[in-house]
Amino acid sequence: MSFPADSVGLVTPQKFQFEEPLHLECGRVLPRFELMVETYGTLNADKSNAILICHALSGHHHAAGYHHEDDKKAGWWDSCIGPGKAIDTNKFFVVALNNIGGCSGSTGPTSPNPENDNRPYGPDFPLVTVRDWVKTQAMLSDRLGISVWYAVVGGSLGGMQALQWSVDYPDRLQKCVVIASAPKLSAQNIAFNEVARQSILSDPDFHHGRYLEKDSYPKRGLILARMVGHITYLSEEAMKQKFGRDLKSGKFMYGFDVEFQVESYLRYQGEQFSRNFDANTYLIMTKALDYFDPSREYGHSLTEAMSKTKCQFLIVSFTTDWRFAPSRSQEIVDALITNQKPVSYLDIDAEQGHDSFLFPIPLYVKTLRAFLGGEEHLKSTSLEAS
């Protein structure tokens, strides 16, 4: 198979093992852990061209390229990573990883627990936070010999990690890109996460998280959780254009099977997701979202938290994103401007809702490329607080 000219092509994941204990915010300790990583491009001699990609809730290390010749689907952010793309692998060395607690090769609930005869951790895997993830990413940086990232980039939950980087390790990144994100979750967002969790926890096949030991799987719960989440990722306009009130069979069936196209879509998305994701991981990821709040240690003042930062910022929001509305990004921007920090902000008119950050929208791609490439048309110091 021939890959597109702007693709990174075939990529091979690498597993990094860390034998030192990892002390977590929850008070527990992982005796050792592993991180699954992919890299694209070439690290230059002085290691100054490295970009870290932080993934969202259902993301992982496979951000670009293909694993096999017959792969039909590229990495989750292939639209932005590759030769000549916004994150140009001809210029940058790009690092993507699967966070701990995940289910794509890094240490998580499906991994063997060395303190329990190497049985899967399951529900015994500790709850982890965005700060824990950033700590492990810093450890990975050390392993790679990268003292300072040229940029740390992330969308949604990934954007929260990028923001945490700027607070916890202000001397270790030059640029921070926060896309379709928020400084902390609203009560509404926490509520959506709780409904998703209860869908899983109430599934009879969940078995208190020990479904692997029971040779079972809470598939129905995970499908429902994904369906709820997916509704929040799309805008009303996107759903209207994609489905409207179209019927699958063209007429009412007067029953509870799938009738509307949007129902069929949600069930399909849930089904596909349930085949590739772990239920315990889903629970962990949603709690990490709920706990995120970099202002907590600064008197709950985001302005005070952002005063510690030293990098340049690009904050991007999308007009139809109601999961993390533009006003949430503006909170970050205002806190940075109050501190006279260099920040560029763009609210992009896009119809895809929260998922817009995954699409190669021309203005979005142009802005990201310009910010990373240092083009002068981004007048970061000229912004005024809204």
Curated annotation (Swiss-Prot):
Family recorded in the similarity comment: Belongs to the AB hydrolase superfamily. MetX family.
State the reactions this protein catalyses.
L-homoserine + succinyl-CoA = O-succinyl-L-homoserine + CoA
Q: Which residues does the UniProt record annotate as the domain AB hydrolase-1?
A: 49-358
Cited function: Transfers a succinyl group from succinyl-CoA to L-homoserine, forming succinyl-L-homoserine.
Q: Which pathway does it take part in?
A: Amino-acid biosynthesis; L-methionine biosynthesis via de novo pathway; O-succinyl-L-homoserine from L-homoserine: step 1/1
Q: Where in the cell is it found?
A: Cytoplasm
Instruction: List, from the UniProt record, the residues annotated as the active site of this protein.
Output: 156 (nucleophile), 321, 354
InterPro entries noted in UniProt = AB_hydrolase_1 (IPR000073), AB_hydrolase_fold (IPR029058), HAT_MetX-like (IPR008220)
| Entry GO MF terms | homoserine O-acetyltransferase activity; homoserine O-succinyltransferase activity
Q: Which GO terms describe its biological process?
A: homoserine metabolic process; methionine biosynthetic process
- The UniProt record lists the keyword Amino-acid biosynthesis: yes
- Binding-site list for substrate: 226, 355
Q: Does the keyword Plastid apply?
A: no
SUPFAM superfamilies membership: alpha/beta-Hydrolases
Q: Where is this site: Important for acyl-CoA specificity?
A: 323
Q: What is its EC number?
A: 2.3.1.46
Single GO cellular component term: cytoplasm
- Which protein is depicted? Homoserine O-succinyltransferase
- Give UniProt keywords alphabetically: Acyltransferase, Amino-acid biosynthesis, Cytoplasm, Methionine biosynthesis, Transferase
How would you summarize the oligomeric state and partners of this protein? Answer: Homodimer.
Q: Which PANTHER family match?
A: HOMOSERINE O-ACETYLTRANSFERASE (PTHR32268:SF11)
